[in-house]
């Protein structure tokens, strides 16, 4: 006796039924036995290994779960996958626990499906893979690349207080992502980018400051919840790399601030731009890391980056009150800011700094006010409201 939980794609919701003879095609199936023993199963998916570390996903080859009642009253649980062609891999996950999931809350099975059901992302055996943009090399309808910003882990972190399975998934996934850290200390975006290649001579395996900053914040959040030591080496290696890039590649501002370019590559030809969302999020992550690790050097670097935002201040504001997206090393501003992402980054940075009476708060408040006016005039939603 027991219960099977599965995600019904056609209904867009979870279903449960008594454990017996059954066939299930779902990104995640949870089997709960009457004894309390639970199986968390991410069913097999098939990928072809493509150039530059990319994957091509074959949805028509998704695996299934088969449950069969036995004569002795037991149940056989079988995961079926497809035979593999040369150059292909398949992966699946099975977690077991002596207790059931809490279906009254937004548990980790629900979180997993959130990131898989629309086809935009997959957790694979070796990392978090997002759909490749059309200007990545290679790209295609079902092409994916390993993204440092593993947003599914954020979902598990947010459920740690109420889901017993969350800590295991956090540890497993963050440890897996740490294996992607290269000899320099960052997690590379392995595909090429036509845009970065054309504008800056930046090839495959480039450093994206935003993606790596978001991953750093995940390590910081996990360390706060799980205790120091588990991921400290990974964080310190990355922070040493970031500090070196900041020291050698920064663009100085009027009173000594440092703008940090959005991208880096050991073979880059031209220094890239700095976007406000990257700069603000990196600044906040450095403050968080400084607090966690008791590092004055990181706080000093964050202060320099914050000073760069103050120095450039009103230069970010467009005539229509929107913000420019980025600034080039020659001081030219470039349009194309996100609808609300940059506002939220400024909001989070200001919130962190608000406990102290710092003069920089005035600039952050001004930039947020201008962006807010533009968002309200154009009907943008999704921004933080404090």
Predicted regions and their residues:
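Carbohydrate-recognition beta-sandwich/jelly-roll modules
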Residues: 1-182, 227-229
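Well-ordered alpha-helical segments within folded domains of soluble proteins
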Residues: 88, 139-159, 204-223, 271-290, ...
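Long, well-ordered core segments of solenoidal/helical folds
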Residues: 108-140, 167-189, 229-255, 296-322, ...
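Carbohydrate-binding/catalytic loop surfaces
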Residues: 122-142, 186-208, 251-275, 318-346, ...
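Extracytoplasmic/secreted proteins, especially bacterial periplasmic and envelope-associated proteins
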Residues: 148-151, 165-172, 214-217, 230, ...
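Acidic/His-rich structured neighborhood in mature extracellular/periplasmic domains
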Residues: 183-238, 245
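Flexible, surface-exposed loop/gating regions in the mature catalytic domains
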Residues: 218-232, 244, 248-257, 261-284
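Active-site/pore-lining binding-face segments in mid-to-C-terminal subdomains
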Residues: 268-331
């Amino acid at each position: 006796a027991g219960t099977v939980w599965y995600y019904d794609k056609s209904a867009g919701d979870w279903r449960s039924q008594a454990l017996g003879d059954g066939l299930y095609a779902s990104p995640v199936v949870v089997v709960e036995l009457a004894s309390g023993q639970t199986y968390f199963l991410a069913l097999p998916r098939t990928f072809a290994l493509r150039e530059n570390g990319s994957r091509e996903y074959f949805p028509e080859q998704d695996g299934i779960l088969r449950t069969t009642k036995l004569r002795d009253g037991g149940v056989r649980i079988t995961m079926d996958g497809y035979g593999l062609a040369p150059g292909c891999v398949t992966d699946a996950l099975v977690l077991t626990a002596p207790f059931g999931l809490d279906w009254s809350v937004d548990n980790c099975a629900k979180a997993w499906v959130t990131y898989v059901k629309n086809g935009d992302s997959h957790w694979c055996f070796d990392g978090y893979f997002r759909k490749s943009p059309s200007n990545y090399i290679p790209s295609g309808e079902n092409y994916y690349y390993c993204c440092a910003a593993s947003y599914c882990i954020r979902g598990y972190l947010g459920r740690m207080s109420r889901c017993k399975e969350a800590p295991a998934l956090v540890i497993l996934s963050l440890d897996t992502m740490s294996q992607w850290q290269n000899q320099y200390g960052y997690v590379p975006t392995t595909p090429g980018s036509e845009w970065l290649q054309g504008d800056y001579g930046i090839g495959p395996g480039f450093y994206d400051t935003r993606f790596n900053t978001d991953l750093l914040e995940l390590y910081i959040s996990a360390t706060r919840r799980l205790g120091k030591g588990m991921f400290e080496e990974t964080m310190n290696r990355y922070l040493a790399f970031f500090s070196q890039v900041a020291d050698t590649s920064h663009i100085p501002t009027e009173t000594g601030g440092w703008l940090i370019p959005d991208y880096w590559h050991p073979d880059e030809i031209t220094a890239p731009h700095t976007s406000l969302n990257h700069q603000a999020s990196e600044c906040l992550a450095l403050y968080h890391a400084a607090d966690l690790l008791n590092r004055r050097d990181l706080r000093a670097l964050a202060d320099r980056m914050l000073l760069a935002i103050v120095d450039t201040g009103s230069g970010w504001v467009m005539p229509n009150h929107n913000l420019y997206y980025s600034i080039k090393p020659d001081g030219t501003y470039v349009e194309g800011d996100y609808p609300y992402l940059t506002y939220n980054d400024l909001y989070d940075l200001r919130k962190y700094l608000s406990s102290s009476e710092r003069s920089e708060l005035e600039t952050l408040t001004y930039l947020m006010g201008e962006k807010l006016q533009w968002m309200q005039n154009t009907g943008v939603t999704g921004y933080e409201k404090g």
